[in-house]
Amino acid sequence: GLQIQHSARSSRIDYSGLHIENARSVIVRHCVFRANQFSIMFQNSRHCTVIHNNISSNIVQNAIMGNAIHCWKCDDMHIAENVIGHNRDGIYLEFVNASRIEHNKVSGCARYGLHFMFSHFNVYRANFFSHNQAGVAVMFAHHVTMLNNVFTLNRGSSSYGLLIKELQYSTIKGNR
């Protein structure tokens, strides 16, 4: 894999170490991402995999801090076995459907370990979320399966393990 580090930073432009747009069947595997505003950003992509990567940021200003893995308008994404730390959100999904997020370790994020909105028919299982503002935030979603995730040592005024807002037709089992 590659080592990608020190992307540009801005409060107006979302710079990323790796930007993937309008793509199919991309695999990001065994890479190291350090000190990027956004480490991996997918837009309008399908059937992509992010697996066995090590991702962290040392950016401390919230205005320019980005997400480790950021997916927007994507389908059939597989995000697995990544070690993620010290980003705004560890994994962020918006308008992402039919995807699997599993066996990731996410810690030390300024907001959420996993944050997804308007994303349906997704499965997240066996992830470990620790020392984040909140473990996972699920908003405006349906048909989500959440199995055997661990949420521990969250901090701050909104320190939830699992924050849910408007979730329908979903299964939540075996989480602790």
Could you tell me what each predicted segment is?
Residues 1-13, 29:
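Right-handed parallel beta-helix/beta-spiral solenoid domain characteristic of secreted/periplasmic
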Residues 15-18, 22-23, 28, 40, ...:
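Parallel beta-helix/beta-solenoid
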Residues 6, 35, 57:
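Short beta->alpha connector loops of Rossmann-like oxidoreductase domains
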Residues 11-19, 34-38, 42, 62-72, ...:
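Extracellular beta-strand/beta-solenoid scaffold signature
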Residues 79, 83-98, 129-153, 158, ...:
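A broadly tuned preference for mixed-charge, low-complexity surface segments
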